[in-house]
Structures are given as structure tokens and as C-alpha cells.
Design a protein with these regions (language model features):
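Dinucleotide-binding Rossmann-like beta1-alpha1 core, especially the glycine-rich loop
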Residues: 44-146
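Short beta-to-alpha linker loops that shape the active-site pocket of alpha/beta-hydrolase fold enzymes
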Residues: 32, 125, 178
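Beta1/beta-strand and adjacent pyrophosphate-binding region of the FAD-binding site
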Residues: 1-11, 27
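Glycine-rich FAD pyrophosphate-binding loop
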Residues: 20-40
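Conserved dinucleotide-binding and phosphotransfer motif residues
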Residues: 22, 113, 184-185
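Gly/Ala-rich phosphate-binding loop of Rossmann-like dinucleotide-binding domains
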Residues: 16, 20, 181
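Helical element adjacent to the flavin cofactor pocket in flavoenzyme catalytic cores
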Residues: 150-187
Length: 187
């Protein structure tokens, strides 16, 4: 083997597939009985393109296109008789807060990479998401705190909407889809 990939979760199976597609003889190993067990199977499967570093943002946006075109990513003849994970592109609204630097760095990153985003004010947030509570609940409180769930001072005034965000319906199944694709190209 040219490479041994340890871990058959979403990252490990994707690495094995990429190496196999590049012509490397690859072996994937995991102590679990199936791909996608472990932390991947318990993840919330959020797909997002907004990160604090330019490199992380670029990597995530590249991966977004794989999720968007899942069958092409997996390769020809992989989908026959196979249940396939689905990407639900819902978009994501991230609030600008003091704690996240009002997303200044994140907005710079997505702007530099021409990733779609919209900056929303309070009026647009409540128009697009009726019933959204814009009271500030920071700082975080432990559940044992009598003030848990009570608003703090101030309001959220702005957010950034990323239309390319969403979620995968089944992260374990997504790992298993990639495993099948990797096996189809010789892993």
C-alpha cells in the first residue's frame, strides 16, 4: 500500500477516496464495524463555509461543492442500489456578537474568496425569521444557574446569512457512501 488511512469516519473515508482517485494504493482501517461510527455518527452534520481562517474557509467552500454535487463526487456507478446521504441547503444565519468579533474576520474571508453572503440588520432578521428572539443571552450560563435561560443586557442587531450552508441528513450514511466510492476505485 502507498497509504494507510486510520479512521473511517467522514474525514478518513474522504482522504481514502481522494488518495485512491489519485492512483494511490490505499488501505482504510478502523476499529469500528462500519464506516461513520464514532463521533461522525453523533455529529449534527452541519455544512458551513464560514471559518475564522482564510485556509479553513477555502477548504470548506471547496467541500461545499462536493456536498452540492454528491453523486458526481462519489463517482460513476457508485449509486446503483445504494442509499445515498442528502445535503439540505438551508442557509445559516450567524449573529454578530462581541464574542465573535462581530464576524469581521469571517466576512473578510468569505469576501476574499467570493463566497455568497448577506449582512442582515435587525429588520431583515425579523422579517425573514419571524419570531426570532434578538435579546442577548450572553454570557453563557450553566443549567444550574437560576438565571439560566434569562436574557442578559442588550440585543443582537446584526447577523450574516450564508446561503451555501446546510446539513447532511445522515452523517454515518455519508461516510459509508464515501467508503463504497473509495472501494470502487481500488481502496
Amino acid at each position: 500500500a502507498d497509504a494507510i488511512v486510520i479512521g473511517a469516519r467522514i474525514i478518513g473515508t474522504a482522504v481514502a477516496l481522494a488518495l485512491s482517485k489519485a492512483g494511490r494504493k490505499t488501505i482504510g482501517v478502523d476499529r469500528a464495524p462500519k464506516a461513520g461510527y464514532g463521533s461522525t455518527s453523533s455529529s449534527c452534520a452541519i455544512i458551513r463555509v464560514h471559518y475564522s481562517t482564510l485556509e479553513g474557509t477555502a477548504f470548506a467552500f471547496d467541500a461545499y461543492h462536493d456536498w452540492e454535487h454528491w453523486s458526481e463526487y462519489l463517482g460513476p456507478n457508485v449509486l446503483a442500489n445504494l442509499e445515498v446521504a442528502r445535503f439540505h441547503e438551508t442557509g445559516a444565519l450567524v449573529m454578530k456578537t462581541e464574542g465573535n468579533g462581530h464576524l469581521k474576520n469571517v466576512v473578510e474571508n468569505v469576501r476574499a474568496l467570493s463566497i455568497p453572503f448577506e449582512e442582515w440588520g435587525e429588520e431583515q432578521i425579523t422579517q425573514r425569521l419571524p419570531g426570532y428572539d434578538l435579546r442577548c443571552f450572553a454570557p453563557a450560563k450553566r443549567m444550574e444557574d437560576p438565571a439560566f435561560g434569562e436574557p442578559g443586557a442588550g440585543r443582537i442587531a446584526e447577523g450574516v446569512f450564508f446561503p451555501t450552508a446546510g446539513y447532511i441528513n445522515d452523517p454515518q450514511l455519508a461516510s459509508q457512501n464515501i467508503q463504497v466510492a473509495a472501494e470502487a476505485v481500488g481502496c
